[in-house]
């Protein structure tokens, strides 16, 4: 760069700094290198699929999928993980359907959870913004985008047309919210449903409510839906297998998948999840229905193997460490033992 251009640039930078404060513009090489701060999901398989060890703080995350697919269970499990690490969590219950007893069984400290049941979409999003601006909340869950009804629609007559109202509401709110979340390092999780476009013959007919803004502003989008047969003990169904696909990821390679097991009444089983990941990584060997770790036979069937590991937390941690070593580039957030 010649001298005249260099001086012009320096003058411009000084003027910007004077007007907007120190650090308003800086060279990328001068910025401190920061590791992505994350909140673990409660599933090692999903943490590895995300590539950063959990959901990113200071960003927007969308969890979407068909009904009863495990979306709210996953969001509540993330809240429980944040609380275990001393964080503060909020749940904006636009659907008015939060079950405190179920949340408690998932590990959520319900007495400390901030809950809001807003009357309108505007109120819900304003609450999210104010909580994020406080800088004191680690994760905010909104359940769900489809239930964020604009004030004009609530006050109008049944059958009135309100084309694009919700999409405009989301677009306006997310424009403001993105910068607020980044400054406060708060993770915002939006749970969303799926709808089918009418008249689509080719391609995927599914879409999500709320317009395109959430798809654009979300750093991570997770497609959560049931996969395969229910989990059975004997003839009794005790849970469901759920496939989570990382559809969008601005922080690591996307399109990775994780299969989770959600048990009725208790949610994710982190030890069974670790067994699945360890088998896939070759740390635990599976021969027929028997599971072995080195020379040690853990048991016949996954439930027996998981039970053996619960009784030996030091072995559980050893296996977890080996899985992470095999994973290589993934660094999980520091936290308590997954099996506790």
Swiss-Prot record:
Keywords linked to the UniProt accession: ATP-binding, Cytoplasm, DNA damage, DNA recombination, DNA repair, DNA-binding, Nucleotide-binding, SOS response
Compartment list: Cytoplasm
One cellular component term from this protein's GO annotations in UniProt: cytosol
InterPro entries for the chain: AAA+_ATPase (IPR003593), DNA_recomb/repair_RecA (IPR013765), DNA_recomb/repair_RecA_CS (IPR020584), P-loop_NTPase (IPR027417), RecA-like_C (IPR049261), RecA-like_N (IPR049428), RecA_ATP-bd (IPR020588), RecA_C_sf (IPR023400)
GO BP field: DNA recombination; DNA repair; SOS response
Function of the molecule: Can catalyze the hydrolysis of ATP in the presence of single-stranded DNA, the ATP-dependent uptake of single-stranded DNA by duplex DNA, and the ATP-dependent hybridization of homologous single-stranded DNAs. It interacts with LexA causing its activation and leading to its autocatalytic cleavage.
NCBIfam families found in the cross-reference section: tigrfam_recA (TIGR02012)
The protein, known as: Protein RecA
Natural source organism: Thermus thermophilus (strain ATCC BAA-163 / DSM 7039 / HB27)
Organism ancestry: Bacteria, Thermotogati, Deinococcota, Deinococci, Thermales
